[in-house]
Regions:
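Structural signature of beta-strand start/N-cap positions in the alpha/beta core
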Residues: 2, 30, 50, 81-84, ...
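Short beta-strand scaffold positions
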Residues: 35, 86-87
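Short His-centered aromatic/hydrophobic patch
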Residues: 87-93, 112
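A general structural signal for well-ordered alpha-helical segments in protein cores
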Residues: 17, 41, 70, 93-94, ...
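Active-site proximal beta-strand in glycosyltransferases
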Residues: 2-4, 100-116
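An amphipathic, basic-hydrophobic alpha-helix
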Residues: 56-84, 94-98, 102
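N-terminal strand-loop element at the rim of the active site
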Residues: 5-65
């Protein structure tokens, strides 16, 4: 199974979701990590993960820019033949849900920290 983990910073993936990525990979899943460009992307790649820089601006409220991001993510899910997308943080969780629906046969999991 190919699983894509999507977060709003590479720092978040490295510090909070790295153990999940390792565990998924150890179970034989292909893992793709997606976040905006940052200093931890190289570290994730150095650990042997496929990391893709997303055109995401955490603070953007521009509807056109956000629509482009959802379209980009949907196309990425389709092109990569992703089976499951897991979105972390509110923006990534919502956008991953919409992109999974646009991509077709992609399962979706959303997680927003701090909700209990």
């Amino acid at each position: 199974m190919k699983i894509l983990l999507f977060a709003n910073t590479d720092w978040y993936l490295y510090n909070f979701r790295l153990s999940l990525a390792h565990s998924l990979r150890a179970r034989g899943h292909a893992v793709v990590l997606v976040s905006p460009d940052g200093p931890y992307g190289k570290r994730l790649r150095d650990l042997g993960f496929r990391w893709i820089a997303a055109p995401l601006d955490r603070r953007s409220l521009n509807l056109l820019r956000e629509a482009r991001l959802v379209h980009w993510l949907g196309r990425l899910l389709r092109d990569e033949k992703v089976d499951l997308v897991h979105g972390f943080t509110i923006k990534c969780a919502v956008y991953a849900a919409v992109a999974a629906r646009l991509a077709g046969n992609v399962a979706y999991v959303g997680a927003v920290g701090g909700l209990g």
